[in-house]
């Protein structure tokens, strides 16, 4: 018999979803080494380890530094309770459109099922901790004029789907975006 409480209310989970800007393609350097044993990540095999870049595993040959680890480290700077740990649930898939993030949809000829895979990993992680937020960084795949007109509506529906899966309609949602550029390449 153990005294461990599951899910642990001091294990704060963050679902990391989107495309390559979330997954990360940046060069790994000395700043990318694990430095906080209270910041963990869920591996592709669904095991918790100390977080390190690359956090995501969607495309191992190009995986690199993304915003996930920096986000968790920044969150820890403001956490006063020494019992709190952060668990990152990496689920981004580079090159996906928001339509590929709908239930039952796939990407790359069935290699990935972005939404379904994310929900499966989220539910596994929630056996150990409590979802505190969803971090989304996607949009380049939907940046043309036609797709961008319906993007916000689709994103709102997706957010609500994730919130329903976590049984908390008030789960905070953070969306990253790219800078606006006043030129067009021709």
PLM features: what roles do these ranges have?
Residues 1-186:
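Cell-envelope and extracellular/periplasmic
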């Amino acid at each position: 018999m153990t005294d461990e409480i599951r899910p642990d209310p001091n294990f704060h989970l963050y679902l990391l979803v989107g495309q390559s800007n979330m997954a990360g393609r940046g060069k790994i350097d000395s700043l990318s080494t694990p430095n906080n044993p209270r910041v963990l990540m869920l591996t592709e095999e669904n095991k918790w380890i100390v977080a390190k870049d690359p956090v995501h595993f969607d495309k191992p040959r190009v995986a690199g530094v993304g915003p996930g680890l920096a986000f968790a480290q920044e969150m820890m700077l403001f956490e006063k309770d020494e019992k709190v740990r952060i668990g990152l649930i990496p689920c981004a898939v580079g090159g996906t459109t928001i339509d590929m993030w709908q239930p039952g949809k796939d990407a790359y000829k069935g290699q990935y099922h972005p939404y379904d895979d994310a929900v499966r990993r989220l539910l596994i992680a929630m056996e150990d901790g409590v979802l505190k937020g969803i971090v989304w960084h996607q949009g380049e795949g939907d940046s043309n004029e036609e797709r961008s007109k319906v993007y916000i509506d689709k994103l709102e529906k997706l957010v609500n789907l994730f919130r329903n899966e976590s049984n908390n309609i008030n789960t905070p949602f953070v969306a990253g975006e790219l800078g606006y550029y006043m030129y067009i390449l021709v």
